[in-house]
A protein has these predicted regions:
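Mid-chain, well-packed structural core segment of small domains
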Residues: 67-87
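Hydrophobic beta-strand residues in large extracellular and virion-surface proteins
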Residues: 9, 13, 23, 38-40, ...
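Short, solvent-exposed beta-strand/turn "edge" segments of beta-rich domains on protein surfaces
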Residues: 49-57, 109-114
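Small/polar-rich, solvent-exposed N-terminal microdomains that initiate assembly or binding
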Residues: 1-52, 72, 88-92
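Residues forming well-ordered secondary-structure scaffolds
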Residues: 4, 76, 112-116
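Beta-hairpin (beta-strand-turn-beta-strand) motif
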Residues: 43-45, 67-69, 102
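Oligomerization/assembly interface segments of phage tail-like spikes and tubes
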Residues: 55-72, 115-126
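Acidic-leaning, charged glycine-interspersed low-complexity segments
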Residues: 83-129
Length: 129
């Protein structure tokens, strides 16, 4: 079930951030890349079932790292992730989103030319068991 959730979350992020931004799962990207990156680790996806035990909806708490050589690009990715609206026609598998936290990350001097933030979101995700 976690693997399906990871795929759903990855495709949702890719659709939102569009081209020019790389989306990674399960590993820290190569910081030599010249483009913006978004990554989340499978270990950081925590699923909890909603109160309705017959439902396929779960809550997924996801920590997403956004990095870019350009602060404006990093901020634009954060904004696009936070500005999502959801309706009945949504086919992404993500039914609702709640913002939990956003903070800047400190990296070692070898990669400090990247602007990086960690965004924590709580997603209501439809997982077919």
């Amino acid at each position: 079930m976690l693997a399906e959730s990871r795929t759903t979350i990855k495709s949702w992020i890719e659709r939102i951030v569009g081209s020019g931004v790389s989306v990674y799962c399960d590993f820290v990207p190569d910081y030599e890349s010249s483009q913006s990156v978004v990554c989340f680790n499978l270990q950081n996806v925590e699923l909890t079932r909603t109160l309705d035990m017959s439902s396929t909806l779960f809550w997924a708490t996801v920590k997403i790292i956004i990095s870019s050589r350009n602060r404006a690009d990093a901020d634009a990715v954060v904004d696009s992730l936070l500005d999502q609206s959801f309706d009945d026609d949504n086919t992404s598998g993500i039914k609702n989103i709640f913002f939990e936290s956003l903070h800047d990350l400190d990296f070692d001097p070898d990669v400090d030319y990247f602007y990086s933030s960690m965004l924590t979101l709580k997603l209501n995700i439809d997982v077919i068991e």
